[in-house]
Structures are given as C-alpha cells and as structure tokens.
Amino acid sequence: MTAWGEGRFGYDKEDIENEAVALAFSFFGGSTFLKEAIDKFMRILITGGAGFIGSHLCDKLLSEGHEVICMDNLITGDTANIDHIRDKRFSFIQYDVTNYIYADGKIDAILHFASPASPIDYLELPIQTLKVGSLGTHKALGLAKEKGARFLLASTSEVYGDPLIHPQKEDYWGNVNPIGPRGVYDEAKRFAEAITMAYHRYHKVDTRIVRIFNTYGPRMRLKDGRAIPTFIGQALKGEDVTVFGDGSQTRSFCYVSDLVEGIYRLLMSDITTPVNLG
C-alpha cells in the first residue's frame, strides 16, 4: 500500500481531506483517486467520549484519519481524559444523550459508549444508568436512522449476569437477576442490545454490538471499584491485596489499547451480531 505523501500526487492526508484540493485535482484526472481517499475518512460521533474507553477511542479514530465529535455529560466522564487532544478534526460537546440528539451535517458512524460502567458508579447512579441504557440508546439509534449512519453499541459481559457456563459464547443468554443491585446495569445493557437489534431488523440500521469484558489501562480511576485499579491502589498504599471468595474465580482482563483495536475492527467489519471482546 502506498504511504500518504508518497502517492501519485505527493500530497499529505490533510491536503486530500480538503475539498478545494479535491476539486482542483478533478481537472487533472485524479478525481477517482481522491474520492477513494476521501471516502476512507468518516465523521464519527462518540457518546461517552470523555470516559475511560471512549477517550481512547477518540485517540484511535483520530489516528486513523477520521473526524471525531465527542459527546459526554461528564457525570462519570472527565475532560482530563481528552485535554491532550489538539486536533482540528476533534470537537467536544457537553450533552446528556437521554435528550434528543442533534448533530449538524453528515454523520457516518455513531459509537454509543455513554453509561456509568463501574460498580461504584452504577450503584450510586441507578436511575441515570437505566435511562442512558434505554432512552440514550433510543436517541442515539434515532440519530443513526436519520443520518444513515453505522451504529456501534458498547454492551458488556454483564449481560451474562452470573453465568452458569464458562467461558461464555455470544449465543449464551445469561443468568441475570433483574432486581439485584447490579440489575440496573445488566438490564440496561440487555435492553440496549434488544432495541439495537430491533432498529437493525425493522429500520435496517447498520448496527454492531460489542460485549466488553474487564478492561484496564491509562485513565482508569484508582477508585473505580473494579479489580485491577483496586489491586494497584492497595499496592501503592502498601496494603494487603484483597481477594474476595476463595480465589478460584476467574476474570478475563484486556488492556485498553487491545480492546480499542478490536472495537475499531468490529466497526469496520460486516458483523451485525454481538461480539465478545476482552
């Protein structure tokens, strides 16, 4: 594959993204080349983009040449996660996606990552967790339908609840307690998956679903409530590392950059059924 800047016209990626350059080159028989180059890049909306995983996705998408609109109400997200981004193709909107979502211009893809995700957060914000999983997903899907955009839902391994099968394959329906304290997160994501598939089947929206397992890495809060940051926090304080139960339990852990690479590949794939990652 020819690298950017080494191709037929010797222009870099920013030049090719510029419509004026594309128009000028159309007079020199380069329109097909330029159209193919420009069409590779998308305008992508990420809800929950200031969160742990969402912010890493912003970085990944920008590195691939796409324009990114980051939307977050900052209930659990933090602008510190995106303050390092100094790219003219990046914009941030503070907004609650349980309300009607308006986005000017074309949107090629929507990645719906808005939701409290750690046990501490969804136990403190149970109603908000249910609302963003239901209303927020509905609003984001409505925008995808309006814009003709591809939609990727960030789901979770928690849709399996307390599984009776190990490891879980995507066709396993799970073992979930809908009225337990974790139920607000589990059921919000199960509903989100159901309405995503309904939009796919009824409205023909091009959808993807990723079921994310335990993820760790930079920008994760030490007081997140999950195992890895808890262990690290205890070690930094010189405390004993707490293991609940008899220690025989298993978890699937994934470094955030590996997860984000998998999410990006799923976004670019033709797979419309849920995919486990982590």
Protein language model regions, located:
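Intrinsic-disorder-associated, low-complexity terminal segments enriched in Asp/Asn/His/Tyr and depleted
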Residues: 12-18, 39
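Short, solvent-exposed loop/turn segments at secondary-structure boundaries
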Residues: 124-125, 219-223
